[in-house]
Amino acid sequence: MAQNGKKKIGLIGGGQIGGNLALLAVQKSLGDVVLYDIPAAEGLVKGKALDINQLAAVDGYDCRVKGTTDWKDVAGSDVIIITAGMPRKPGMSREDLLEINLKIMTDVAGNIKQHAPNAFVINVANPLDAMVFALHKIAGLPKHMVAGMAGVLDTSRFKCFVAEALGCSIRDVEALVLGGHGDDMVPLVRHSTVGGVPLTELIAKDKLDAIIKRTREGGAELVGLYKTGSAYFGPAASAIAMAESFLQDRKRVLPAAALLEGQYGINGYFFGVPVQIGAGGVEKIHTVELNDGEKAELEKSFQSVKKTVDSVKL
């Protein structure tokens, strides 16, 4: 908690996602923000902090952002969101980032262990499932105080494409995407509805298959369009949804990468499933009844995650 009694949010990585996280956090009055990056990026984080603070009078918020390169400023954070790492570029998979981002995560996790061991930590860095596994191991965080942001974003993309296909309000689309944050993620079509009507009754199978494919390739589509980086608005909003539920004890049920201990037949790996997030962190892990086809798809997704995680050398 900040010295002024407000909640304190530590953002590790001052790039596109980090900057948007800082803006969203103060606009929602979630707490004061510390935007951290390495010394080479000192001007970047201090500039973004100043820019956002000068916007306060326009939007009418009283929370503040501090740009820093000193981990001591992160100490006492209630929640930490990690975005530090190399972003994807055209032609790269999330797994291609493993070696370089693992080195970054090792440093970040060690500093969290030293300076903010009681924070609820949300990882956004890719490859998501492997990075959150490394974070948990290195920082020694309790299993309920660490999670990976993936499912909120993947589900949001799926809902977006469904709403576009039907020309309906996205608010009426209920859907869930499980599994790893990669090409084998599992949109649960059978459990998806629009205004209570099953999705399968509204969209033909071939069109649904195309939506599923586009959802799985959603990150790559944006990488191809941006050319020099990856998505940042969506990831930032998704991570803030998780942080907000923790900070305000909203107990929202959101798809996120959590440590499984037998659920869905998986043990000892972080995997995307519906979880309840409240003041206690990941308070519950919910299981969804799956048919044989869905189980097979989820197992395929898990094997992809397992292969990447098992290659992590700590």
Curated annotation (Swiss-Prot):
Statement: the UniProt record of this protein carries the keyword Transcription: no
Record-listed E.C. numbers: 1.1.1.37
Active-site residues (renumbered): H181 (proton acceptor)
Residues where NAD(+) binds: G13, G14, G15, Q16, I17, G18, D37, N101, V124, A125, N126
Descriptive protein name: Malate dehydrogenase
GO molecular function: L-lactate dehydrogenase activity; L-malate dehydrogenase (NAD+) activity
Chemical reaction(s) catalysed: (S)-malate + NAD(+) = oxaloacetate + NADH + H(+)
Pfam families the record matches: Ldh_1_C, Ldh_1_N
Family label: Belongs to the LDH/MDH superfamily. MDH type 3 family.
Highest taxon, organism lineage: Bacteria
Keyword Hydrolase in record: no
Cross-referenced InterPro entries: L-lactate/malate_DH (IPR001557), Lactate/malate_DH_C (IPR022383), Lactate/malate_DH_N (IPR001236), Lactate_DH/Glyco_Ohase_4_C (IPR015955), Malate_DH_type3 (IPR011275), NAD(P)-bd_dom_sf (IPR036291)
PANTHER family: L-2-HYDROXYCARBOXYLATE DEHYDROGENASE (NAD(P)(+)), L-LACTATE DEHYDROGENASE
